[in-house]
């Protein structure tokens, strides 16, 4: 099908999201198969999944990057992004949700809501992404569809509404009752799920299905309270309500974020995936339903509102960078307004840099097809952009707009890295530069005292995979040190400084004079540097140099050399010399001034605190809690179900190295654990002294 056939109302930009191992990628593979995009089903456990195209993904059976593809169903074009479920790759989920219009949340029928399900659900809430839920793995031992629905309500605060009633469970799962059409769907095993039979609802389920359908209708009546005719029918003649009426109200409720309909199935056993495809088209929003896109005009500071129209001015967001050995740098974009043509010149308004598009590519995992243009609602990739990174806005040169950026969390773990030979040094620098462009949560810095290169990321798996990619993709041999905690520094009170940088050694000298005021910024807000210079006491051409110097000064703290965070700096006064002042002098002076001010502002060291979830047999609960307490953990609460207990805690990352090994020995290998970064907190004084000594 050509793209010209699709109006905006027939486009769906959706993500598939879940906890690791809930079956996201398998669900996506079945969608590709049924929609005719692939002619053979790829299996994750065999390393053959189309969407898991990186070697590391196929070996480890997990999704690391967000793969994109397009399928066609019920006369609509569906752009799908399959996202990772592992906490170390949370930025992949964040940047995908930022550009999507809707999402399918996949849950395991046995486990229900798991820790990473909560994380991705929160991320979707943040961007207001409408969702439907798919309870997968109904064929597993212990599968409980209604238990999963209940856990969505309890743990996510979701208004989860069952639209199916399973027929059988575990190995006896043969299909489901569709509560909207009031038909029982039985899947024929010999057709790989492509065919099913519609039958009457089995007698033993009729009463339960009547109750569930009535609950569904009553919930829908609260979605659209202005629709009095629908409410009246629900109260007086529910049997007269048509399927079309239900779909119309359901769609409205989903788009407004008031309800989350829940389907069931088994992607691996080919049951229920086409029904999921149907509701993606019927209930999830098109770009039109998501409304106008808001941004800011950087020159005037005014809010700009653009309609999703292909004839409007261009507004697109770069949400991912990928390096390809043959094509080079590929930038993934979502177009919110206007049309982008191959060969056109555009503006990166975030950086105020002109860019030129050399090629446009439609992606299917790592395969690509050349395109002449992308228009509003499209998700695609372009080649030729030199300056654009994740979160940058691309627009027309004469109509500047900057869209909301994508926030990247602070890394929590560091490793030293060095090339194995001199020949690897340049290749290592290129690899680190390319990988940090691709991934905003991967940072590269230099330890000022030792001169070592330090790489920082979201966890051991994150850095392990990036190291693996350096060897395979960039052919770099490197030695890495042990993982270390990525500490930060901050200040606890306001302070100021007055610094002069004067050098006289014959000929032209160096002169700069800078006065700063600093104060603690809101936790998590990052560093802010502003100029309050008036009257030209520092000429305006030198102000950027002072700001650059201050920013560089904040990169290494005053206690133990860790980067400073959450510091607000105001440049308030200074002076210059007609001959001796230069950009370099003001940059050095800015760096010295901020260090001096920070020393007087009662600096402290911050450590990453992890949100830890442990699921353990109840007879080991006391040992697990005792062990977490010994690790300076704070127990937030515990829940019990089926002889298992779930413990939620906040524990400093420095205490969690080797935790899985110790947990296995404590519980004879019967407990599981997940952890994700929660926030940074001040370290106890005794530990701070030990860190500074090191």
Swiss-Prot record:
GO terms for molecular function: GTP binding; GTPase activity; translation elongation factor activity. It is found in: Cytoplasm. One of its GO terms (cellular component) is cytoplasm. It holds the Pfam family EFG_IV. Keywords: Cytoplasm, Elongation factor, GTP-binding, Nucleotide-binding, Protein biosynthesis. CDD domains: EF-G, EFG_III, EFG_mtEFG1_IV, EFG_mtEFG_C, EFG_mtEFG_II. It comes from the Bacteria. SUPFAM superfamilies: EF-G C-terminal domain-like, P-loop containing nucleoside triphosphate hydrolases, Ribosomal protein S5 domain 2-like, Translation proteins. Residues 9-288 form the tr-type G domain. GTP binds at residues 18-25, 82-86, 136-139. GO terms for biological process: ribosome disassembly. Catalyzes the GTP-dependent ribosomal translocation step during translation elongation. During this step, the ribosome changes from the pre-translocational (PRE) to the post-translocational (POST) state as the newly formed A-site-bound peptidyl-tRNA and P-site-bound deacylated tRNA move to the P and E sites, respectively. Catalyzes the coordinated movement of the two tRNA molecules, the mRNA and conformational changes in the ribosome. Belongs to the TRAFAC class translation factor GTPase superfamily. Classic translation factor GTPase family. EF-G/EF-2 subfamily. This is Elongation factor G. The gene is fusA.
């Amino acid at each position: 099908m050509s793209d010209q056939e699709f109006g905006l109302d027939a486009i769906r930009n959706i993500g598939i999201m879940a906890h690791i191992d809930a079956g996201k990628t398998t669900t996506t593979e079945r969608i590709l198969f049924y929609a005719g995009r692939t002619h053979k089903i790829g299996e994750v456990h065999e390393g053959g999944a189309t969407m898991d195209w990186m070697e590391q993904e196929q070996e480890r059976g997990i999704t690391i990057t967000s793969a994109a593809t397009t399928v066609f169903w019920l006369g609509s074009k569906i752009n799908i992004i399959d996202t990772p479920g592992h906490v170390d790759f949370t930025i992949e989920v964040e940047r995908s949700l930022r550009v999507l219009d809707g999402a399918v949340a996949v849950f395991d029928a046995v486990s229900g809501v798991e820790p990473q399900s909560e994380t991705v659900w929160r991320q979707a809430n943040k961007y207001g992404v409408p969702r439907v839920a798919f309870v997968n793995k109904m064929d597993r031992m212990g599968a409980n569809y209604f238990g999963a629905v209940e856990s969505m309500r309890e743990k996510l605060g979701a208004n989860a509404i069952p639209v199916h009633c399973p027929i059988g469970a575990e190995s006896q799962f043969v299909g489901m009752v569709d509560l909207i059409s009031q038909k029982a769907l039985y899947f024929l095993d010999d057709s790989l799920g492509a065919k099913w039979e519609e039958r009457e609802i089995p007698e033993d389920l009729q009463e339960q299905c009547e109750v569930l359908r009535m609950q569904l209708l009553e919930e829908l009546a609260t979605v659209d309270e202005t629709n009095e005719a629908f409410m009246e029918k629900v109260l007086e003649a529910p049997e007269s309500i048509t399927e079309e009426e239900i779909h119309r109200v359901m769609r409205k409720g989903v788009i407004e974020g008031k309800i989350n309909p829940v389907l069931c199935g088994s992607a691996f056993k080919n049951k229920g995936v086409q029904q999921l495809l149907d509701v993606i088209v019927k209930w999830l929003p098109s770009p039109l339903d998501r409304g106008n896109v808001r941004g800011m005009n950087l020159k005037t500071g005014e809010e700009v509102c653009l309609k999703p129209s292909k004839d409007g001015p261009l507004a697109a967001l770069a949400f991912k960078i990928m390096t390809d050995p043959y094509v080079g740098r590929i930038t993934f974009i979502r177009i919110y307004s206007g049309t982008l043509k191959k060969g056109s010149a555009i503006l990166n308004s975030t950086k105020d840099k002109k860019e030129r598009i050399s090629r446009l590519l439609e992606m299917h995992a790592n395969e690509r097809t050349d395109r002449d243009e992308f228009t509003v609602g499209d998700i695609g990739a372009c080649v030729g952009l030199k300056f654009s990174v994740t979160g940058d806005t691309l627009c027309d040169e004469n109509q500047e707009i900057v869209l909301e950026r994508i926030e990247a969390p602070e890394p929590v773990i560091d490793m030293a890295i060095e090339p194995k030979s001199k020949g690897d040094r340049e290749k290592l620098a290129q690899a680190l530069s390319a990988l940090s462009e691709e991934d905003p949560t991967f940072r590269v810095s230099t330890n000022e005292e030792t001169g070592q290169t330090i790489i920082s990321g979201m966890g051991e798996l994150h850095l392990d995979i990036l190291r693996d990619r350096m060897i395979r993709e960039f052919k770099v041999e490197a030695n890495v040190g042990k993982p270390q905690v990525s500490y930060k520094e901050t200040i606890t009170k306001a302070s100021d400084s007055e610094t002069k940088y004067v050098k006289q050694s014959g000929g032209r000298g160096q002169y700069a004079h800078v006065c700063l005021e600093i104060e603690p910024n809101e936790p998590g807000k990052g560093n802010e540097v502003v100029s309050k210079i008036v009257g030209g006491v520092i000429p305006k051409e030198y102000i950027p140099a002072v700001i650059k110097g201050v920013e560089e000064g904040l990169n290494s703290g005053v206690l133990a050399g860790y980067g400073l965070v959450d510091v607000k700096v105001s440049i308030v006064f200074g002076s210059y010399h007609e001959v001796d002042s230069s950009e370099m002098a003001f940059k050095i002076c800015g760096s010295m001034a901020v260090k001096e001010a920070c020393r007087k502002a009662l600096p402290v060291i911050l450590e990453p605190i992890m949100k830890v979830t442990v699921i353990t047999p109840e007879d080991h609960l006391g040992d697990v809690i005792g062990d977490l307490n010994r690790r300076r953990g704070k127990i937030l609460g515990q829940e019990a179900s089926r002889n298992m207990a779930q413990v939620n805690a906040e524990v400093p990352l420095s205490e969690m190295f080797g935790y899985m090994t110790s947990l296995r020995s404590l519980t004879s290998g019967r407990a599981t654990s997940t952890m994700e970064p929660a926030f940074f907190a001040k370290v106890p004084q005794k530990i701070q002294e030990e860190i500074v000594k090191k």
